């Protein structure tokens, strides 16, 4: 009975990946090699994928492909490409200990580690999110350059301000930054 339940769950999950926008992206007869994708500017628009878990899964697949490709090419002191991850909390979500399931926390940890390591292979990563507290703390810690625009919520200001080694006064000032102004660390 357990085996049939697992089979049914897997079939349902795989079937859901084969329909709609996900199906057009994942269930194809011909794919584009990662080498070709990285040879030009490319945008992966995932708006049609409504489920955050599926978005994280697709982004994770792309990230693993990118990581393995750069790793196989060897280390580089030259910037070979930049990956921009908007609304990064979908991939690098802050899951407080005790919440969520272990596989999600493990996956998030692996993604954070991959992002930290991939820089040594010449890959730049730009992590963008409007709510710092939604991001895994390792993501914030592992970024080399931090840029923050006006941030109103106190918990978000404290989170990013601490990562930027700001004084309490500087953290408070983040709520009054004008449009186009930012703090950089």
Located regions from the model:
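P-loop NTPase motor domains
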Residues: 1-116, 120-123, 182-184
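Conserved ATP-driven motor cores of ASCE-family P-loop NTPases powering translocation/secretion/packaging/pilus
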Residues: 106-185
């Amino acid at each position: 009975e357990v085996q049939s339940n697992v089979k049914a769950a897997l079939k349902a999950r795989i079937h859901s990946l084969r329909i709609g926008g996900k199906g057009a992206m994942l269930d194809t007869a011909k794919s584009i090699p990662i080498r070709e994708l990285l040879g030009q500017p490319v945008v992966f628009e995932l708006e049609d994928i409504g489920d955050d878990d599926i978005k994280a899964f697709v982004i994770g697949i792309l990230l693993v492909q990118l990581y393995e490709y750069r790793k196989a090419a060897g280390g580089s002191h030259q910037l070979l490409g930049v990956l921009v991850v908007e609304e990064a909390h979908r991939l690098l979500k802050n899951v407080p200990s005790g919440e969520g399931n272990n596989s999600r926390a493990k996956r998030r940890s692996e993604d954070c580690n991959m992002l930290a390591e991939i820089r040594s292979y010449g890959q730049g990563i730009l992590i963008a999110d409007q709510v710092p507290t939604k991001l895994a703390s390792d993501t914030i810690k592992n970024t080399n350059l931090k840029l923050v625009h006006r941030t109103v919520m106190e918990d978000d200001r404290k989170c990013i301000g601490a990562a930027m080694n700001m004084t309490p006064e500087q953290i408070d000032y983040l709520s009054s930054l004008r449009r186009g102004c930012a703090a950089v660390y």
